[in-house]
Structures are given as structure tokens and as C-alpha cells.
Amino acid sequence: MAAAIASSLIRQKRQARESNSDRVSASKRRSSPSKDGRSLCERHVLGVFSKVRFCSGRKRPVRRRPEPQLKGIVTRLFSQQGYFLQMHPDGTIDGTKDENSDYTLFNLIPVGLRVVAIQGVKASLYVAMNGEGYLYSSDVFTPECKFKESVFENYYVIYSSTLYRQQESGRAWFLGLNKEGQIMKGNRVKKTKPSSHFVPKPIEVCMYREPSLHEIGEKQGRSRKSSGTPTMNGGKVVNQDST
């Protein structure tokens, strides 16, 4: 008796659940058009426009313009004084007799008409000349890193600052090494002397991106030999008069 009552109650509960589920599914199937509030014609027009938007909304492939590339060279710069210009990892610039030193490799990047940037390959720093004629190394490319490249009458190449020169005479300031292989102040170097004469010895031709030009004195990522001090190159006083 108790079992029959329990069975009957179970069947009633099951039927109630099934009827409720049927009503819910029926209500889902009967989505009355009247609830939309729009006519059949309006819905048709909206459907057409949605398809049009979908088709026209496809993104066309963007054609990227090729980045401007500059053809430069990896080279060694051999001075008539008998030294190769070199840049150490800490940014120190001097000369060495060791032709095979990796520190003598420089990127010569054209940045204007007969104007180049001289960048140490290993240090990734630029050779620069400040307003007092001292050479230093820079993390960023500034106007002080631009050098005019000229061929002298004896077929040696000379590099002069594009930014600074003698105010009275207008004489250019040159990159130079003295007889001891030390760098010289640019305003002490004369283009007629061996100290300013270099022979580029190209290793390979490379393509470079144009360096981003920064303002002079802009904060650099790493501390380097600062401009405006006579104790450049790790505390060695630059010999200003030796040629």
C-alpha cells in the first residue's frame, strides 16, 4: 500500500515535470512576431543591410610601405699615423695597431649628402664631437654625431663635424689621431696633417635603417663619456697639440 502511494506520487511528480518542460519548449518555439514590434518588411530590409555591412566591413589588406633603407658599409678606418680607429665596449675611443681587433669595426651610415654617422659595431655607440672639440661616444644619434666625409687631394678621407667650426676663420673641426694613437681635439686637427687622414678598409656592404635624430644633451640610457670635459677616454687627458 505504501509502495503504491509512493509510486503514484513519483509518477505525478514526473508528469508535472514533463508538462512544465513541454510548456517551456513550446513557449520557446512560439516566438510571436508581434513581440518584435517591427513589420515583416522592416525586418527583411534590416537583414539585407546587415548582410551589406558584413560584406563591406571586411578589412582590406594594408600595404605597408617598405622602410627607407640606407646603404652603408662595415669598415675599418686606418689612420696615416699607423693606427686603426677603435671604440671599446665602454665607449672609449682611441687607436690600435691590431688590425684584427673587433673594436676597430665601424658602421659607416649615410645620413645626408656626403654626411655619415660613425657607429662602433661592438659598442653600438656613435662617435660624436661636442662644442669644445672633444670626441665622445653617444647612445643616441644627435647632430653632434654627423660628420662630413671628404676625399683629400692625396686620396685620404677626412671627417669633419657638420655642427662646429672655428668662429673667426670658419675652419672645420676634424676627427684625428696623434702619433701615440690618442684622439685629438677637433679644433687642433688640420686637414693637411696626417692626424686627420684616414683610409677606409671596407669589410662588407650593409643596409641600415635611418637613425632616429635626438636632441643634444638628451638623457641617455647608459652613462658615457660626457661632453665638455678634457678628461675623455677613461680619464686620459687628450693630447691637443701632437700631430
From Swiss-Prot:
Expression sites by tissue: Brain, eye and testis; highly expressed in embryonic retina, olfactory epithelium, olfactory bulb, and in a segmental pattern of the body wall; in adult olfactory bulb, less in cerebellum, deep cerebellar nuclei, cortex and multiple midbrain structures.
Alphabetic keyword roster: Disease variant, Epilepsy, Growth factor, Nucleus
One Gene Ontology cellular component annotation held by this UniProt entry: cytoplasm
Effect of residue 114 to H: In DEE47; increased function in positive regulation of SCN8A voltage-dependent sodium channel activity
Keyword Nucleus listed: yes
One Pfam family linked to the record: FGF
Disulfide topology: none
CDD domains: beta-trefoil_FGF12
Subunit annotation: Interacts with the C-terminal region of SCN9A.
Family, per entry: Belongs to the heparin-binding growth factors family.
Physiological role: Involved in nervous system development and function. Involved in the positive regulation of voltage-gated sodium channel activity. Promotes neuronal excitability by elevating the voltage dependence of neuronal sodium channel SCN8A fast inactivation.
Protein name in UniProt: Fibroblast growth factor 12
Species of origin: Homo sapiens
Gene: FGF12
